[in-house]
Amino acid sequence: LMDEKNGLKFTLERDCGLKVGDLAEVVGFPNLSGPSPVLQQCLARAIGRQPLPPSSPLEPGKLISPDHDSTVVHVEGLLVGLSQQKNETILELQAGVHTFAARLESRNPSSPLSVPIGARLQLTGVYHGIGGNRAEGRALDSFELLLRSPTSIVILARPPWWTLERLLIALGSLMTILVLVLIWTSLLSRKVTQRTAQ
């Protein structure tokens, strides 16, 4: 649930058919024990439709903040890991000194997400703070992004072609060629020496 700037998590008592973009009234019991307040055992109803508020940028130095919790944000990062689990794809990204996960529900597990490791990405999703307790003054431990669809992932730059693995293969190939050339010249030198001795 989100207004212009703030977000709030809530758990429904029963499904009420809310969809993304619905304007809703929500009533529930507050729980203040986590990184941000959560309404539990909620009853909700849609009272209209409204465009989603624009995403706000996450700055590299201010990634972990309870102020972002449950809001739509966008962040740039370097893809360092990609794994497919039962019903979701998990992207592991690095932004500055922080590493975080982005989760994308897999609607079609037979066609996995194909994003190359090392690519620079921009992700847009809902910020989900992990750990911490605002009431006790404990800071967030980390966060993850909950992505809506594959369109929430934009590839800003592909990884460089010269990776460490490719560089080592090229150096190994050159060393092998150099050794073969040295062996061939040594054999040729012996033959020339034998012929001149005759």
Where are the regions a protein language model picked out?
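Charged/polar helix/coil "stalk" or linker segments at domain boundaries
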Residues: 126, 195-198
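Alpha-helical transmembrane signal-anchor helices
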Residues: 159-196
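OB-fold single-stranded nucleic acid-binding module
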Residues: 1-165, 169
